[in-house]
Amino acid sequence: MQGSVTEFLKPRLVDIEQISSTHAKVTLEPLERGFGHTLGNALRRILLSSMPGCAVTEVEIEGVLHEYSTKEGVQEDILEILLNLKGLAVRVAEGKDEVFITLNKSGSGPVVAGDITHDGDVEIANPEHVICHLTDDNAEIAMRIKVERGRGYVPASARIHNEEDERPIGRLLVDATYSPVDKIAYAVEAARVEQRTDLDKLVIDMETNGTLEPEEAIRRAATILAEQLDAFVDLRDVRVPEEKEEKPEFDPILLRPVDDLELTVRSANCLKAEAIHYIGDLVQRTEVELLKTPNLGKKSLTEIKDVLASRGLSLGMRLENWPPASIAED
């Protein structure tokens, strides 16, 4: 029993009933009242829509140009074959996001997933899954199948606008169901701990396609949920700060030579004689200081003030950290 009235009970794994290799029931208890539905619904949604897995996304069938055609010697039409390929349960080695597998079959009878040729990085979890039927001994079918890793459900229509220009004729797109979970349901029953009878027991009933064990699927779903909730544990601002462009320390015009002001020869020579080489040097001088410059009179001073004003500058400005390193090194 919890140590205080404010402490929440923590569920423990009570039972895993393995009905088959792909079907299991997982029971957790005790849960505080209402938490059965809270956790059950959250896990159910993640298991159905957010579990990563592998699925067939494209197929090329020899002699077939589009999905609305038929193939001689094959009982099913092409749309039925594509629908059957959606049910292919494929496990691909970690580290590979896409693989290609092939199928070549001839002779009368069913064509099943076990007829597919693949390398050691691929495993077919449902080898008895029927893809199509060949109707006579001379019939044959050959196809190249693309399997990709993804998450959730992605219809073929969502990929058409991205690939239509590059997709060659005869490459057929397949609706991709990446989730390894086929069915998921949960039930909340009454549970009891000592004198408390208002507690919940959560029973999760789940079936997978065989590429992932039910127990591991629930473990992964719980991990996804916990990672998403981490942000709420510490509500500090965790946004990545925007990178701001560094503003130059000085207005670029201040780094330009005095000659760019196009002063009269007399005024320009007077400034050079006083070692005023850059506009930044000039704007820091006052009128009084410039009038003390030999051969620089009021007419030249007025010219300098007017030229600076036309550029939004004036005499007597204060520039911190002047001169910049690039000028000081010169």
From Swiss-Prot:
Pfam families: RNA_pol_A_bac, RNA_pol_A_CTD, RNA_pol_L. Residues 250-330 are annotated as: Alpha C-terminal domain (alpha-CTD). It catalyses: RNA(n) + a ribonucleoside 5'-triphosphate = RNA(n+1) + diphosphate. One of its GO terms (molecular function) is DNA binding. HAMAP family: RNApol_bact_RpoA. DNA-dependent RNA polymerase catalyzes the transcription of DNA into RNA using the four ribonucleoside triphosphates as substrates. Belongs to the RNA polymerase alpha chain family. The N-terminal domain is essential for RNAP assembly and basal transcription, whereas the C-terminal domain is involved in interaction with transcriptional regulators and with upstream promoter elements. This is DNA-directed RNA polymerase subunit alpha. It comes from Vibrio parahaemolyticus serotype O3:K6 (strain RIMD 2210633).
